[in-house]
């Protein structure tokens, strides 16, 4: 059934033919094997870590094949649009080292020859293809009200019939052109639906780049193509956009897998060659004895802003996500400790098929490794950039004491086993505060940590003697420790663990207790870098002042 007259009434403002757009957006001139991928978010709120995960896969595959990675904004649901979301998306991706070859560059700006890259600006294109389907009898106007559709669904469920708008349950599927025109002239509201040629008793065989070979029944639902506001549904826009923008690989979350029968059918009905599909496993979280989807409501780490606020270096988040993408990344990193992550090649076929577990403990481990491998000057730059925005007090202290701060960040950096003190920048303050008098002298006596089994009285006795006898200007850490050991032995502490275990009553404790008391006086903590290095950084006068403070508690 042809609807030429009806098509002219509904889409009277359409200026071009489908052939015009197919010619306007020709196949891209790229080398063989180059992939064209996209990140296509809706501007409806904050960036989810799952979005960064998907974008990273798309960007890596395009980049490593010398292809194109573009940004398309899917803003057909304008009621939910959040102001500034597009700029936030662009800034977030840039912050994560992902810049787009083409696409949106701002709220109203873009670059590239395959635009517009904002769906709300592509109505003419969608209407052209909808008009063509209407003329061919592959689409029709549906005048059902929301109330009628709700009642239909209730009846279907009550009678244990597959719910939906299809076949005999599609009231206006076989409407005549004359009736449709009359209803439109009477001012009745309508939408445009696909007249599905599918038979659910037939199956479609399909190869997913991650899931492998899958089979599903043909779609027989008369899905909506154009909504009442004149904008397309996601399904219709996806087929047209990804064909005309010449996307080679649609890489998206597995929540869209159930829509694949509709999308495959739309490509066939429109006469388009379908792209390759890869459905990424959903990011999951361990919650007690079970796994669940990482939730925007329940989990702070679901929001991309969380990683910035707590201070995970961007590169560590990327490297952790690459661990999820391909389990071989961890082995590659161990073999290439100094290599840039861009050198790692992502392979979809090596990706897990089931839910990807997001583990903050593992992320912390990855982050500690990467920060430990950084140069002290880089740690300083990254930390001050973070502190400037999130910790004004520390920003002031480290920038006013830049030389000392870099010395602190360089502790044990050049040895075979660098310290792994920090996983994120919000941990730095608690780990290095004692280097700064402004923070150290704020601490109360109750905050001082003593070695297990060492009383405050015993610790004071050690510090009082050590203050009188220690030598500050010793040539090495080894010489400093020999000095500490001699003082400890004179105080009645054992230097040999085996001897102490054999005769514990003959000693006050171990030399480690002596070192622990000195550490407590200088740092108020039981865990810190070696005491000799701390003393060299804060200086002799400050060292003696801290001993005095401790003795006056």
From Swiss-Prot:
Q: Name one GO biological process term.
A: glutamyl-tRNA aminoacylation
Q: Name one Pfam family in it.
A: Anticodon_2
Q: Which residues cross the membrane?
A: none
Q: Enumerate the UniProt keywords alphabetically.
A: Aminoacyl-tRNA synthetase, ATP-binding, Cytoplasm, Ligase, Nucleotide-binding, Protein biosynthesis
Indicate which residues form the motif 'KMSKS' region. Answer: 293-297
Enzyme Commission identifier(s) = 6.1.1.17
What catalytic activity does the UniProt entry give for this protein? tRNA(Glu) + L-glutamate + ATP = L-glutamyl-tRNA(Glu) + AMP + diphosphate
Binding of ATP, residues: 296
Assigned GO CC terms:
cytosol
Q: What's a single GO MF annotation on this record?
A: tRNA binding
Compartments reported by the entry: Cytoplasm
Q: What is its main location?
A: cytoplasm
Which ranges belong to the motif 'HIGH' region? 41-51
Q: Which domain of life is it from?
A: Bacteria
Q: What family does the Swiss-Prot or TrEMBL record give for this protein?
A: Belongs to the class-I aminoacyl-tRNA synthetase family. Glutamate--tRNA ligase type 1 subfamily.
Q: What does this protein do?
A: Catalyzes the attachment of glutamate to tRNA(Glu) in a two-step reaction: glutamate is first activated by ATP to form Glu-AMP and then transferred to the acceptor end of tRNA(Glu).
Q: How does it assemble?
A: Monomer.
PANTHER family according to UniProt: GLUTAMATE--TRNA LIGASE, GLUTAMATE--TRNA LIGASE, MITOCHONDRIAL-RELATED
| UniProt name for this protein | Glutamate--tRNA ligase
Organism encoding this protein = Clostridium beijerinckii (strain ATCC 51743 / NCIMB 8052) (Clostridium acetobutylicum)
């Amino acid at each position: 059934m042809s609807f030429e007259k009806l098509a002219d009434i509904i889409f009277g403002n359409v200026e071009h033919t489908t052939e015009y757009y197919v010619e306007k957006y020709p196949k891209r001139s790229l080398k063989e094997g180059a992939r064209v991928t996209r990140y296509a978010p809706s501007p409806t709120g904050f960036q989810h870590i799952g979005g960064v995960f998907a974008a990273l896969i798309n960007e890596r595959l395009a980049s490593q094949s010398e292809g194109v990675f573009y940004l398309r904004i899917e803003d057909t649901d304008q009621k939910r649009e959040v102001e500034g979301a597009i700029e936030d998306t662009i800034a977030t991706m840039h912050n994560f080292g992902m810049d787009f070859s083409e696409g949106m560059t701002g709220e109203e700006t873009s670059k590239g020859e395959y635009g517009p890259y904002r769906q709300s600006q592509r109505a003419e294109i969608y209407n052209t293809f909808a008009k063509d389907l209407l003329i061919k009898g592959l689409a029709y106007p549906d005048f059902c009200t929301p109330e009628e559709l709700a009642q239909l669904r209730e009846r279907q469920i009550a009678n244990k019939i597959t719910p939906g708008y299809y076949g005999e349950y599609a009231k206006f599927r076989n409407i005549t052109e004359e009736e449709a025109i009359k209803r439109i002239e009477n001012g009745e509201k309508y939408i445009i639906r696909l007249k599905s040629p599918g038979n659910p008793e037939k199956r479609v065989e399909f190869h997913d780049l991650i899931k492998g070979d899958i089979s599903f029944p043909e779609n027989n639902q008369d899905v909506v193509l154009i909504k009442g506001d004149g904008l397309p549904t996601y399904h219709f826009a996806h087929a047209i956009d990804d064909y005309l923008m010449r996307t080679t690989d649609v890489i998206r979350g597995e929540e869209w897998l159930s829509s694949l029968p509709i999308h495959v059918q739309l490509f066939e009905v429109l006469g388009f060659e379908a792209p390759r599909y890869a459905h990424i496993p959903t990011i999951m979280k361990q919650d007690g004895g079970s796994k669940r989807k990482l939730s925007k409501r329940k989990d702070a780490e679901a929001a991309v802003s969380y990683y910035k606020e707590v201070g995970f270096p961007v590169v560590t988040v990327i490297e952790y996500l690459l661990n999820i993408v391909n389990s071989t990344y961890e082995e590659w990193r161990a073999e290439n400790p100094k290599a840039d992550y861009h050198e790692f090649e992502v392979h979809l076929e090596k990706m897990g098929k089931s839910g990807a577990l997001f583990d903050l403990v593992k992320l912390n481990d990855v982050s500690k490794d990467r920060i430990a491998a950084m140069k002290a000057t880089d740690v300083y730059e990254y930390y001050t950039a973070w502190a400037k925005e999130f910790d004004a007090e520390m920003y002031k202290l480290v920038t006013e004491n830049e030389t000392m701060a870099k010395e602190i960040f360089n502790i044990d950096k050049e040895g075979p086993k660098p310290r792994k003190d920090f996983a994120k920048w919000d941990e730095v303050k608690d780990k290095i505060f004692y280097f700064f008098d402004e923070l150290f002298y704020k601490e109360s006596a109750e905050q001082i940590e003593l070695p297990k089994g060492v009383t405050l009285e015993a610790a004071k006795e050690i510090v009082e003697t050590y203050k009188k006898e220690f030598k500050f200007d010793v040539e090495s850490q080894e010489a400093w420790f020999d000095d500490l050991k001699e003082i400890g032995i004179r105080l009645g502490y054992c230097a040999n663990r085996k001897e102490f275990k054999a005769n514990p009553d003959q000693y006050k404790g171990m030399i480690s207790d002596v070192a622990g008391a000195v550490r407590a006086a200088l740092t108020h903590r039981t865990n810190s870098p070696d005491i000799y290095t701390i003393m060299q950084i804060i200086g002799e006068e400050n060292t003696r002042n801290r001993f005095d403070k401790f003795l006056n508690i």
